[in-house]
């Protein structure tokens, strides 16, 4: 299940609406909504873990490359005339490396999605109270409360 942040926002825009005429059904729908978004959370959490491992692997690969310790065949395809030994210089090269940056951006994207889903799950957990308050307000307006 691959979902983008935009798709996630569209899904929540639709799912967040509470039908005032069917509060009983909305109440019964809470567990399935929670399951839906918790499944998404777990999937994205695992994708983030995978991306973290990829970043570690790429960082090691690029460190070897920039320090001149990579397999000689690598330099035939992609020559690098320097051998970086200084820690600060190495960090600058790693920070500027496109492969490493792309993986870091992917992790940041997953973090944004996870934070968004966490906020959705909090709203879903409070939905029972929202529905209860809506029912009490309807009773009050009809003179029953």
Predicted regions and their residues:
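Charge-rich amphipathic alpha-helical interaction elements
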Residues: 1-145
């Amino acid at each position: 299940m691959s979902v983008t942040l935009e798709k996630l926002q569209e899904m929540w825009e639709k799912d967040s609406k509470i039908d005032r005429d069917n509060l009983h059904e909305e109440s019964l729908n809470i567990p399935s909504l929670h399951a839906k978004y918790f499944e998404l959370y777990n999937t994205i959490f695992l994708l983030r873990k995978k991306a973290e491992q990829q970043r570690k692997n790429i960082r090691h690969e690029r460190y070897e490359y920039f320090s001149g310790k990579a397999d000689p065949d690598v330099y035939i395809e992609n020559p690098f005339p320097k051998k970086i030994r200084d820690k600060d210089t190495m960090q600058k090269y790693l920070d500027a490396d496109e492969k490493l940056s792309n993986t870091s951006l992917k992790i940041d994207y997953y973090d944004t999605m996870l934070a968004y889903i966490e906020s959705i799950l909090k709203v879903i957990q409070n939905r029972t109270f929202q529905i209860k308050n809506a029912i009490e307000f309807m009773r009050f307006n009809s003179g029953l409360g």
